[in-house]
Structure formats: structure tokens, C-alpha cells
């Protein structure tokens, strides 16, 4: 049998020169088969299209304050809105899953009026919202080894494809496995009590931070609502390039088209309050907020001699950007709580956790981080009440 390697060796010099060009052309042709076909639409149509023919299923972080009031939970605990904000962090979501289980087992897990999630935090959010009875599901998601499949994408062509056979759809299948009609019904029941479940995505077309009211989507209760619920979770955790963007069908003035959504962490590493609130100097109206920020990441700078290959440089650059954005949001949120006499609680991966992942979504690493989060959640000092000293360096 003649292998491609042997065939290339037998080519004349000039033809060997053009062999790589032919390979690149083939790759480009194959990747083009996985390019999303888009329906054109205008900026005016993009302003506030409807999803599922239902109004107010999502909002935007830069909306006027009055329109965001609908996201305020009616449910309070001891007169306060208890609000859990879950950050992004990829495989480091194992920390948040373990931390919540530790709180549960220590008997000191708050009852949350509202839960928000971004990226890996979005995958945690529905289970955190529904309470300790779902802790085992989270443990399975982050420690059973199933998440390691996310790093086993469709090979080199997957990074060139946004749809089709080469695109990496493993995240979509993972979400479909864990989010079913029963979970949707449970979320809808809690939403009816006045609680709120919010998930953030980034709309690539408008470059806006989208805040999805997942409880309201759940209350629609149709098969299409379940599909949308899954799509939003998948989009929020869809790291650009690694996973394809998620197309969400919308409608404006009778015109149907699709928006492209990716990782919510592209525009917001963690959602405490929309930027409209964070940037205002006046007091936030309504019930006082008891804010809990659960950061699935380190917040202190870690020295590392970065390797010179493209992947190492890209990963280090992305992680640095996320870390800086996360620290900024922590400080903005802390100052908002100070201005309004709200309570502030923070948990994050500390510098005392020293294990390093040997590969993306390493099961052994995620198990170690889950155990670390669990012990931290059980400890008397699970939460700190001001930004970490490391973040000031």
C-alpha cells in the first residue's frame, strides 16, 4: 500500500513543493463545508427580537435600569435578596461544585433567591439553583471523567468548522444528557415562587452581554423551551474556537433569523449586577442584597515561564485576560455593596491549591480541585468578606 508519506517522497521536487499547498486547499475546502449559513438582518432588528414568540425571556446588561427591574427576585430570605453569582473557569468549575457540596454537608448553605452563571458557572447554575439534592449530579459532571471528553474534539478540523461533521459538538451532547424535561419543570416551579435563575451569553453579532431568564424559559414548558434552555447553557460555556457558536432563532417584525451566541465570559466573567447598576453611584432600590460570589478560578497572579509555542501563548493570554476582568468585577461588586450597605461574600481558588492540570479537562485535576473546594466549603471560613489581598498586588 502506498501511504501519503511514501507518495510524497516519490514526487518530483517541484511537485513536492506544491504538496503542502494542496493539503491546505483540501483543509480549507473541508472546513468550508462546516461554515454556518447566515440570514442577513439589520441592527434595528437586532435591538430586541423575540425568542419562542414570547416577550422578556432575555435582557441585556446595558439595558436601562427600569427594564432590568423584571429580573429582581420577589423571593427574599430574612428580608434580603440572597444572590449567588457563579463565574466562568472551564475545568475549574470543579471547585464550585465541590464548594457547594461542602456547604451543604456542613449545614450552612444559604437559600438563594437568585443564581446567575457564566460559562462553566452556567453549567453549575441550574443545579445550584435547585439545591443540595442536586449536589451528586454536579459531582458526577465534574469528577466522573465525562467532562474529559470535551477535550477530545473533532481533531484539527474542528477548530476550522462552525457546523457540520467536523465541529466539536461534545459540549452540546453533555448538556443534553444532564438537562431534561424533569429539570426544566423543577426550575419552573422555583421560578413560580419568585426565585430567579439567570445565565449569560455573548451575542457575537451585536457584541452585547445577554442575560437569559432561565426560569421564565422553563415556565414556557414546551419542547422548544427545553431546546432553548439547553442552547443557552451550551452557548454560555462555548469557548470560542474550541466549541462552535450556538445559533438561536429569533424573530423581529415577522423576520426570522438566527443570532450567534458564545461563551458569556467573553463579555462578562461573572454576573453580579448588570453594568447599569455597577457603574451608577446612587443606591440600588428595593430589598437589600446579600451577595455571594463563587469564583471558579484563581484571582492572584501566578508566575510561570510560558512556553513559546502558539497554544501556550494563546492559553496564557486568555487566562490573563479573564483573571484581570474577574478581579475588576470583584472590586466593582465589592464597592457597590459598600455604597449600598449590602453584605459581600467571596470564595475563590486560593494560592494554596498547587496541583497543575497535565491536560485540558484532566479528570485527576478536577477531582483534586473538587476535593479542595469541598473542604473549603465545609470550613468555618468558607467565605471572605472583602477582595483578596492577592488581588491588590
Task: Give the location of each predicted region.
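Active-site loop->helix "elbow" adjoining a glycine-rich segment at hydrolase catalytic centers
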Residues: 91, 119-120
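N-terminal secretory signal peptides that target proteins for export/translocation
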Residues: 1-15
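C-terminal motif of bacterial Sec signal peptides marking the signal peptidase cleavage site
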Residues: 29-32
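Intrinsic disorder/low-complexity signature
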Residues: 2-3, 18-19, 50
Amino acid at each position: 500500500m502506498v501511504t501519503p508519506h511514501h507518495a510524497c517522497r516519490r514526487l518530483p521536487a517541484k511537485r513536492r513543493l506544491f504538496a503542502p499547498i494542496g493539503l491546505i486547499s483540501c483543509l480549507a475546502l473541508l472546513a468550508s463545508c462546516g461554515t454556518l449559513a447566515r440570514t442577513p438582518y439589520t441592527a434595528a432588528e437586532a435591538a430586541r427580537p423575540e425568542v419562542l414568540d414570547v416577550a422578556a425571556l432575555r435582557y441585556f446588561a446595558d439595558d436601562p435600569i427600569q427594564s432590568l427591574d423584571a429580573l429582581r427576585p420577589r423571593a427574599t430570605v430574612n428580608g434580603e435578596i440572597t444572590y449567588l453569582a457563579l463565574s466562568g473557569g472551564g475545568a475549574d468549575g470543579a471547585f464550585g461544585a465541590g464548594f457547594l457540596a461542602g456547604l451543604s454537608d456542613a449545614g450552612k448553605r444559604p437559600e438563594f433567591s437568585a443564581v446567575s452563571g457564566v460559562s462553566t458557572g452556567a453549567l453549575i447554575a441550574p443545579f445550584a439553583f435547585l439545591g443540595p439534592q442536586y449536589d451528586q449530579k454536579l459531582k458526577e459532571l465534574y469528577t466522573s471523567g465525562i467532562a474529559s471528553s470535551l477535550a477530545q474534539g473533532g481533531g484539527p478540523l474542528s477548530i476550522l468548522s462552525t457546523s457540520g461533521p467536523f465541529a466539536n459538538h461534545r459540549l452540546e451532547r453533555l448538556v443534553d444528557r444532564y438537562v431534561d424535561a424533569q429539570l426544566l419543570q423543577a426550575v419552573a416551579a422555583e421560578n413560580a415562587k419568585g426565585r430567579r435563575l439567570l445565565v449569560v451569553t455573548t451575542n457575537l453579532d451585536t457584541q452585547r452581554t445577554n442575560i437569559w431568564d432561565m426560569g421564565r424559559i422553563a415556565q414556557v414548558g414546551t419542547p422548544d423551551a427545553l431546546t432553548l434552555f439547553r442552547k443557552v447553557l451550551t452557548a454560555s460555556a462555548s469557548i470560542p474556537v474550541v466549541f462552535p457558536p450556538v445559533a438561536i432563532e429569533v424573530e423581529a417584525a415577522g423576520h426570522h433569523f438566527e443570532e450567534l451566541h458564545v461563551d458569556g465570559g467573553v463579555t462578562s466573567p461573572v454576573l453580579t449586577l448588570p453594568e447599569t447598576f455597577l457603574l451608577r453611584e446612587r443606591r440600588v432600590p428595593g430589598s437589600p442584597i446579600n451577595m455571594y460570589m463563587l469564583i471558579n478560578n484563581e484571582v492572584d497572579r501566578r508566575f510561570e515561564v510560558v512556553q513559546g509555542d502558539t497554544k501556550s501563548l494563546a492559553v496564557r493570554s486568555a487566562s490573563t485576560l479573564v483573571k484581570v476582568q474577574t478581579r475588576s468585577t470583584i472590586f466593582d461588586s465589592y464597592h457597590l455593596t459598600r455604597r449600598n450597605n449590602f453584605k459581600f461574600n467571596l470564595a475563590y481558588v486560593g494560592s494554596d491549591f498547587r496541583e497543575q492540570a497535565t491536560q485540558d479537562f484532566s479528570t485527576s485535576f478536577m477531582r483534586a480541585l473538587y476535593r479542595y473546594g469541598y473542604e473549603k466549603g465545609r470550613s468555618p471560613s468558607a467565605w471572605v468578606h472583602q477582595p483578596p489581598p492577592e488581588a491588590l498586588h
